[in-house]
Amino acid sequence: MGDGSSSRSNSSNSTSEKPEWLQQYNLVGKIGEGTYGLVFLARTKTPPKRPIAIKKFKQSKDGDGVSPTAIREIMLLREISHENVVKLVNVHINFADMSLYLAFDYAEYDLYEIIRHHRDKVGHSLNTYTVKSLLWQLLNGLNYLHSNWIIHRDLKPSNILVMGDAEEHGIVKIADFGLARIYQAPLKPLSDNGVVVTIWYRAPELLLGSKHYTSAVDMWAVGCIFAELLTLKPLFQGAEAKSSQNPFQLDQLDKIFKILGHPTMDKWPTLVNLPHWQNDVQHIQAHKYDSVGLHNVVHLNQKSPAYDLLSKMLEYDPLKRITASQALEHEYFRMDPLPGRNAFVASQPMEKNVNYPTRPVDTNTDFEGTTSINPPQAVAAGNVAGNMAGAHGMGSRSMPRPMVAHNMQRMQQSQGMMAYNFPAQAGLNPSVPLQQQRGMAQPHQQQQLRRKDPGMGMSGYAPPNKSRRL
């Protein structure tokens, strides 16, 4: 297919050659690629011609159709709706090869690139208002997920998006639900799903082989992200032994222990039950660490509210680790500067907004992901989704909404989703409504959804007997 130019030109001469769904969009180019597949930037042809991120999944490893990971992501995203969670706009199937495309609202930025820009280009840290606003919105979205019994299981800076357009400028969106799971009374240990969470953000109970874990693993990851926003570098940069499927990662634990100190039975009573602590093949129990102290690494006063919140997120014992709901009520968010809905407005009258770079876009490709021969180019802000340094004065800054779970209603099933039997492909009974299979609350019950697992910090609270399945 060459560089994709000729095939794209031919298809543009005859739109009838394109699938009907594809004719809804004007392709801008490829903006990402990973183990899951490709991500494209497109614009809707109908006004207001908004930017859309289209995620194309690779075929399943067995070559027999749509990836189960993609199906699980769809099944979750179609059920949730919240300002701080990425919005699934549509699902498209190319029946010629059964390739799957998910369409999302496009986010111009992510925390990984924002942090890197400050570290490598700007040369100074993010201001307190921006850090606080980004963190509050992340916790707000996570609280919604946990209230609906969903663990994300892969929180990291690159999966935390930030909108760049005018209407939602500076709003955080949690993305990438490929590893997310329903977690109330699982039918089997979650450890059966294999290794989860990128290693630098992986909770110690996972590293030590816990078979049953809770939403507390997400809160550990948020703590790591919080520290990274403060220091512009990952807090625990362990080297992963990728050749092994064993969850135990000695170097990562070593990095954690050197900063937080050695865990003890007094602080973490259930530590003795974790397989890799119990077996102690690597003799980690006897190893002594001279902790440098978390406060010294993140440069925070130990009596400051910011340090108090961070230390509670990085609590060893998952039963004692702060929850998203509790974190939203923390003193840190009640002090000036208060967090806002737009994380990127200036925190001081004379302060300049940071001009973050737009995403590089490979414009020499098509929706099949044909390899380009030219390097990707950054598309001008006016042609994509807006520039960070636009006219966003102090008047655009707004206070966060009340700290409750917002927009609990679920997304309506679109026609694009109706075209494929997702429940059957996901191993669910298509004749039974999804809400019944998952134990999802009916509309009149939705406000009663609350986390009641041990990760809530409610020690001694027995999980409900109702099953939640995916």
Curated annotation (Swiss-Prot):
Enzyme class: transferase
Domain Protein kinase, chain residue ranges per copy: 25-333
This protein's GO CC annotations: nucleus
Disordered: region residues: 428-470
Catalytic residues (positions): 154
Entry's Gene Ontology molecular function annotations: ATP binding; cyclin-dependent protein serine/threonine kinase activity; kinase binding; protein serine kinase activity; RNA polymerase II CTD heptapeptide repeat kinase activity
Database matches in CDD domains: STKc_CDK8_like
Chain residues that bind ATP: 31-39, 55
Stored PROSITE patterns: PROTEIN_KINASE_ATP, PROTEIN_KINASE_DOM, PROTEIN_KINASE_ST
Quaternary structure note: Interacts with MED14, HDA19 and LUG. Interacts with KIN10.
Family indicated by similarity: Belongs to the protein kinase superfamily. CMGC Ser/Thr protein kinase family. CDC2/CDKX subfamily.
Protein name: Cyclin-dependent kinase E-1
